[in-house]
């Protein structure tokens, strides 16, 4: 594998090498320079949040170059030597397969199960070996750029987060509760919602009874609004389940329980807002003549932007047809809607120069994503936990009762709430241009943490564990030196074109799952995408006590953000993998009881990997790695009684090596490995006697921006 050349690095850092042809809406957004008064987050005056529906990261971006997709070099191990892509289903395995719009109805692909029970069955506490058994074979389908022209163009132009997770192993409403309140109940009222409930209008004496973030904004004098058309918000506004908003709706003149087909919801107005300020969270803020009146549905947002009245914080809830939800919507329809929102925001350049648009997805539906979620440790049957944490995680376990009055929530089962699988997240703004990837761990609470950073209104419902693990999105921006860019113009899909495509797709049969002999993993092209600096500095070392049959692993976090380490025992893959949450500035250690041999596979953020393999019959060399600038210092220490020979294999990033090291009993040897030419990426495999192996891979962070893993893909 060739090393990364200077030319490749410069090309990636400049623009991602991907701005070839972009829709006018994106081109216009890129052409408007950022407002720069302080060169900090204080320059942001408006944050707009559009949460779409039910797509996994791999389904949309598994083949997108330069992100952690199908070319991921370090994935979880499965039983029988299978790769994570070879998911068991009855008597065969199913690989991710292309939902090819030329072969069938890809745009309106069938939805899959996506509730608490089947989500946990698929995740299986991190084992993830039988995904389609829980989620159906359709869950393994993915899209290419031909099915996702706008979403891929948006990623090429702005910033895509490739480690953004939904907040729960669950469906729509529980995840959206995190977006609007920072919790599904445990930290707000010592209760829990894990199934959809109270997601529409209802009586004010029923519903969730903890405080929401819009209420805190209102109290702090921060202007906010939820833009939605009633009656069609597709049940995607979780604020509808809270009594204060229900009461505001009834007092505004709406029925508490509207009959089916009711479409006479009272339009929002400034006069109503003066009396009922929470009505803008659950009211008809985008009144339209009927369900096909898309211009009417967006007119209120357009007027606010044109008049310079866009609130400081806005949430947009799309109607069903444009929500991107499987069955009821499609990628092209959702892309068209997002494009319309972006067009509206850029109609007023002064407003757009101060605006951040966050486009994310509430959950993955049931669609497959290969990365293990950075969840809290899972409970074992004996009451112990598979892993540890330096921060309490009782808020992350389903041990809380249902909210009072609930009729749908199941009995607590002790399982982990989340975070769940990865979903796409676009950071669209004048400060995030350039086709960047950001690989920090985020979830829906990260959106609220970003609002906290900008507007100073804290959300106490966000648990200490979530704050330790999930970042605040600020690493996705460069406020001091925003990148200018102006790509060329191409024609965009109109609403008529989108709807015609959708109709033609619906006339076709579903895309079939390929026969076993015709399967093949989709190609992710190798590309070093410009990648934001991350707050991680992690160290892992292992030591063997042969006499006691114990392998000890120590995890140290010297970075500024907590991290979750996943450890798979490849000799016992039927066991729950252990997960360790290590806060910034802290460390953890744990033991593995081994028989004659051990084989541990450890994964962390942004491709961080350690592998430890060997036998237990004698003392073995120990390896530690310490970062120094863009270099890695590797120290080998031998505590055995006879000499040990270790070979350090050729580094695939730099082509340097191999190296031979002969260790005498009691001797320590250190070597320095420079990673500047590879953007900080390293991959070192150490091979010794009797099957002894250590592997160390990852990216060294220095506070400077870099590139994504240049060896991902083919």
Residue ranges and their predicted role:
Residues 2-714:
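N-terminal pro-sequences and low-complexity stem/linker regions of secreted or lumenal proteins
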């Amino acid at each position: 594998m060739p090393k990364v050349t200077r030319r490749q690095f410069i090309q990636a850092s400049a623009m991602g090498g991907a701005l070839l042809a972009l829709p006018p809406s994106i081109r216009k957004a890129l052409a408007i320079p950022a407002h720069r008064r302080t060169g900090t987050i204080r320059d942001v005056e408006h944050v707009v949040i559009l949460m779409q529906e039910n797509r996994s990261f791999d389904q949309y971006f598994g083949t997108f170059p330069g992100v952690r997709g199908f070319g991921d070099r370090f994935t979880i191990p499965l039983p029988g030597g299978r790769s994570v892509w070879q998911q068991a289903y009855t008597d065969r395995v199913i690989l991710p397969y292309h939902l090819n719009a030329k072969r069938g109805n890809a745009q309106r692909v069938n939805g899959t199960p996506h509730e608490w029970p089947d989500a946990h069955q698929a995740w299986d506490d991190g084992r993830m070996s039988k995904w389609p058994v829980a989620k159906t074979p359709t869950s393994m389908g993915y899209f290419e750029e031909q099915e996702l022209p706008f979403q891929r163009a948006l990623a090429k132009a702005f910033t895509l987060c490739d480690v953004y997770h939904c907040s729960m192993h669950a469906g729509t409403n529980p995840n959206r509760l995190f977006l609007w309140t920072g919790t599904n109940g445990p930290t707000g009222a010592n209760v829990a919602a894990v199934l959809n409930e109270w997601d529409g209008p209802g009586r004010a004496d029923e519903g969730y009874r903890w405080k929401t973030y819009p209420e805190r904004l209102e109290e702090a004098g921060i202007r906010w609004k939820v833009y939605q058309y009633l009656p069609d918000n597709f049940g995607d506004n979780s604020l509808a389940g809270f009594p204060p908003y229900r009461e505001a709706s009834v007092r505004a003149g709406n029925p508490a329980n509207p009959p089916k087909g009711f479409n006479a919801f009272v339009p929002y107005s400034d006069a109503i807002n003066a009396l009922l300020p929470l009505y803008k969270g659950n009211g008809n803020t985008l009144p339209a003549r009927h369900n096909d009146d898309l211009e009417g549905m967006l007119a209120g947002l357009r007027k606010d932007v044109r008049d310079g009245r866009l609130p400081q914080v806005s949430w947009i809830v799309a109607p069903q047809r444009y929500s991107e939800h499987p069955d009821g919507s499609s990628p092209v329809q959702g892309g068209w809607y997002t494009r319309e929102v972006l067009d509206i925001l850029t109609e007023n350049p002064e407003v757009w120069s101060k605006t951040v648009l966050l486009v994310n997805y509430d959950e993955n539906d049931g669609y497959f994503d290969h990365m293990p979620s950075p969840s809290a440790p899972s409970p074992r049957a004996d009451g112990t936990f598979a892993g540890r944490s330096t921060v309490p995680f009782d808020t992350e376990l389903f041990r809380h009762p249902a909210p009072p009055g609930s009729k749908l929530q199941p009995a607590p089962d002790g399982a982990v709430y989340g975070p769940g699988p990865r979903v796409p997240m676009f950071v669209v703004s004048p400060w995030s241009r350039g086709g960047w990837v950001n690989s920090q761990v985020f979830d829906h609470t990260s959106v609220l943490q970003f609002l906290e950073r900008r507007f100073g209104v804290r959300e106490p419902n966000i648990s200490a564990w979530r704050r330790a693990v999930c970042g605040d999105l600020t690493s996705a921006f460069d406020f001091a030196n925003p990148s200018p860019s102006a790509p060329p113009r191409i024609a965009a899909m109109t609403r008529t074109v989108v709807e015609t495509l959708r109709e033609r797709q619906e006339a076709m049969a579903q895309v079939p799952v390929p026969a076993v002999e015709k399967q093949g993993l989709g190609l992710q092209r190798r590309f070093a995408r410009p990648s934001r600096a991350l707050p991680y500095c992690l160290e892992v070392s292992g030591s063997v006590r042969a006499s006691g049959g114990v392998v000890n692993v120590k995890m140290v976090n010297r970075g500024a953000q907590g991290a979750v380490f996943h450890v798979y025992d490849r000799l016992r893959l039927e066991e729950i993998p252990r997960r360790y949450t290590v806060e910034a500035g802290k460390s953890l250690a744990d033991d593995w009881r081994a028989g004659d041999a051990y084989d541990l596979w450890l994964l962390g953020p942004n491709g961080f990997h350690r592998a430890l393999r060997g036998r237990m019959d004698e003392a073995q060399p120990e390896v530690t790695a310490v970062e120094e600038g863009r270099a890695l210092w590797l120290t080998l220490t031998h505590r055995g009684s006879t000499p040990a020979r270790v070979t350090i294999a050729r580094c695939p990033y730099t082509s340097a090596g191999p190296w031979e090291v002969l260790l005498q009993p009691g001797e320590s040897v250190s070597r320095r490995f420079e990673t500047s030419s590879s953007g900080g990426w390293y991959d070192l495999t150490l091979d010794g006697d009797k099957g002894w192996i250590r592997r160390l891979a990852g990216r060294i962070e220095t506070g400077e921006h870099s590139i994504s893993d240049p060896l991902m893909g083919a």
